[in-house]
UniProtKB/Swiss-Prot annotation:
The keyword RNA-binding applies. This is Large ribosomal subunit protein uL24. HAMAP family: Ribosomal_uL24_B. SMART domains: KOW (SM00739). Belongs to the universal ribosomal protein uL24 family. GO terms for molecular function: rRNA binding; structural constituent of ribosome.
Length: 106
């Protein structure tokens, strides 16, 4: 089970964007990376491509960051938190915050 999923609110805990909060737009599990909204934004100089209908210029692009550089945001404590996996009585696995044991996304 993935501890960070698409739609989770995360906090960057290390790197040039440390302290920024954003929503996970995409998870790349094979690469161990996530794309977070408003984090690791770079400027790309793009040539015009009339075949695809693309205009040229400087475009902002959001790149992925390593999943170890983000932590899920716990709304109860208003801090970054770790995530654990708990099995319920009916056999389902759910994600829980390590600090207070509450369900993630509940």
């Amino acid at each position: 089970m993935q501890k960070i999923r698409k739609g989770d609110e995360v906090v960057v805990i290390t790197g040039k964007d440390k302290g920024k909060r954003g929503t996970v737009l995409r998870v790349l599990p094979t690469e161990g990376r996530v794309v977070v909204e408003g984090v690791n934004v770079v400027k790309k100089h793009q040539k015009p491509n009339p075949v695809k209908g693309q205009a040229g210029g400087i475009v902002d692009k959001t790149l992925s960051i390593d999943v170890s550089n983000v932590a899920i945001f716990n709304p109860a404590t208003q801090k970054a938190d770790r995530v654990g996996v708990k099995t319920l009585e009916d056999g389902r696995k759910v994600r829980v915050f390590k600090s207070n044991g509450e369900l993630v996304g509940a």
